[in-house]
């Protein structure tokens, strides 16, 4: 199987290298090409990726620090659509901080084939073996929950894109991640777009790698910070800036929920 893997990186040289090598070496039945959006790394990541091109099939795109996660993914996916029309069986969206297990991608491909070209969301566990990221199911409105491994036959609504296998024809139909997003929400939005286009999304049958949960410490949800600090962090590009949050909610849930949704975070901050 020919797989095009896309990810964004910034100043995680060793993790980036390990991610690429683990994916390739752990899935020998797959033929991988990588498109990597390096968002202005200063730790030698970009130069390392250039050197790795002598061994692996890697295209490196160079940013200047303003892409962030979703922006970098959008750039990489748009590049792939232009450079590689109809050239692959699958698109693989990954995060470079995932420690992948052996044959994890091959197993996801087998599951996708058995489930008739399903989008397979790779479930992540933390160091304690507990679910950390993966497929998502909405409960009511925009409130959601993480899906369990045992629910792999249950259709998902969207995903955290730590590792997502998308049939290439679905990628070509839906297109790239929405360029409006800079850091967060881009992956959730993309999953919802795939679902709207008629594609089935499912959780992987087993954990495909280790990726620990991001800590809330120092973020806008950290109640130990002052209200002003939380407000500033919320409107930061890596927080939940109001314009992007409103855009996401309106696009996917309608104007009514969007208006309610943009007010809720401020109430949380005020109430502490």
Regions found by a protein language model. Give the residues of each.
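Glycine-rich, basic loop-to-helix element that forms the pyrophosphate-binding segment
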Residues: 63-83
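A short, conserved alpha-helix in the catalytic core of glycosyltransferases
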Residues: 164-166, 170-175, 180-207
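Short beta-strand-to-loop acidic/aromatic patch adjacent to the donor-nucleotide binding site
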Residues: 87-99
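A conserved acidic beta->alpha catalytic loop
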Residues: 38-47
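A recurrent flexible, glycine/aromatic-enriched loop bordering the glycosyltransferase active site
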Residues: 145-166, 233-234
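Short, acidic, metal-binding catalytic loop of nucleotide-sugar glycosyltransferases
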Residues: 21-31
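Non-catalytic, C-terminal membrane-associated alpha-helical segments of glycosyltransferases
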Residues: 217-272
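Conserved donor NDP-sugar-binding/catalytic core segment of glycosyltransferases
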Residues: 99-134
